[in-house]
Curated annotation (Swiss-Prot):
Summary of subunit composition and partner proteins: Interacts with AXIN1.
InterPro entries reported in the protein's UniProt record: Aida_C (IPR025939), AIDA_N (IPR023421), AIDA_N_sf (IPR036818), C2_domain_sf (IPR035892)
Cellular component aspect of the GO annotation: cytoplasm
Region Axin-binding, annotated ranges: 153-220
The keyword Transmembrane helix appears for this protein: no
Keyword S-adenosyl-L-methionine listed: no
Keywords: Coiled coil, Developmental protein
One GO biological process term: negative regulation of protein-containing complex assembly
Coiled-coil parts of chain: 27-62
Name under which the protein is recorded: Axin interactor, dorsalization-associated protein
Length: 305
């Protein structure tokens, strides 16, 4: 083990212990910050492409799973409900795994998957990577470099049902855009945020759109909300960020976003308005994307025992 890797593992371990200490002391804001910062570092290492990494692909996958667990614990702490989806005792099981990552060869104790790297971008950070441009213009020409292989989609299964509790399935049918046919490998990132823009559930990405025609990009994919409707905090909203690949700049950009508030949760079809980027999770400065009648088309199904 090189000195650089030894130092890296020590820093990660210290950060995990700090977060767990804050967590056990009830200092939840500090714990969430520590968990999210560490998750960001772990995700970057898990997705790193540099050749001088001492971590194997399998070890990187484990590092990515630890990052996912940190995100889950962070989301659990932000919930107002007493039931915690990912407990502190669970989190503490990660410390020896992270410490011994170079020799760890057992099955990971939790059924989670690494989150794609782009999920760790802070709100607005993605947009800061590019110059302002006219979004009414084309999205550029030329084939992406195996982009679909880089974005497999991260949809999660439906939660177990509980008596008296409601689960929500949202089918993303299609989105209306003036230049729909020019969007390369489009997909939608779905997240649930409180009024402060903090995640209440794990973030999910759809697979790349199934087809494009005229002014529509079709998805026809189901999103399972990762929290019972009754357990969502007051003022929460479900966000849908439409993203596409820009070959000239070689990164993924958010084109527009939409959101649905809690009073809009009801069975059946719904169309919601599209807003200009950057995504405003706090819903303070909203600007419609276009005056044209173009929307995000959804269909909701509620499941209650």
């Amino acid at each position: 083990m090189s000195e650089v890797t030894r130092s890296l593992l020590q820093r990660w371990g210290a950060s995990l212990r700090r977060g767990a200490d804050f967590d056990s002391w009830g200092q939840l804001v500090e714990a969430i910050d520590e968990y999210q910062i560490l998750a960001r570092h772990l995700q970057k290492e898990a997705q790193a492409q540099h050749n001088n990494s001492e971590f194997t692909e399998e070890q990187k996958k484990t590092i990515g799973k630890i990052a996912t667990c940190l995100e889950l614990r962070s989301a659990a702490l932000q919930s107002t409900q007493s039931q915690e989806e990912f407990k502190l005792e669970d989190l503490k099981k990660l410390e020896p795994i992270l410490k011994n990552i170079l020799t760890y060869n057992k099955e990971f104790p939790f059924d989670v998957q690494p989150i794609p790297l782009r999920r760790i971008l802070a709100p607005g950070e993605e947009e800061n990577l590019e110059f302002e441009e006219d979004e009414e213009g084309g999205a550029g020409a030329g084939p992406p470099d195996s982009f679909s292989a880089r974005v497999p989609g991260t949809l999660l299964p439906r939660l177990p049902s509980e008596p008296g509790m409601t689960l929500l399935t949202i089918r993303i049918e299609k989105i209306g855009l003036k230049d729909a046919g020019q969007c390369i490998d489009p997909y939608i990132t779905v997240s649930v945020k409180d009024l402060n823009g903090i995640d209440l559930t794990p973030v999910q990405d759809t697979p790349v759109a199934s087809r494009k025609e005229d002014t529509y990009v079709h998805f026809n994919v189901d999103i399972e909300l990762q929290k019972h409707v009754e357990r969502l905090t007051k003022g929460a909203a479900i966000f849908f960020e439409f993203k596409h690949y820009k070959p000239k700049k070689r990164f993924t950009s958010t084109k527009c976003f939409a959101f649905m508030e809690m009073d809009e949760i009801k069975p059946g079809p719904i169309v919601i308005e599209l807003y200009k980027k950057p995504t405003d999770f706090k819903r303070k400065k909203l600007q419609l994307l276009t005056k044209k009648p173009l929307y995000l088309h959804l269909h909701q199904s509620l499941h209650k025992e």
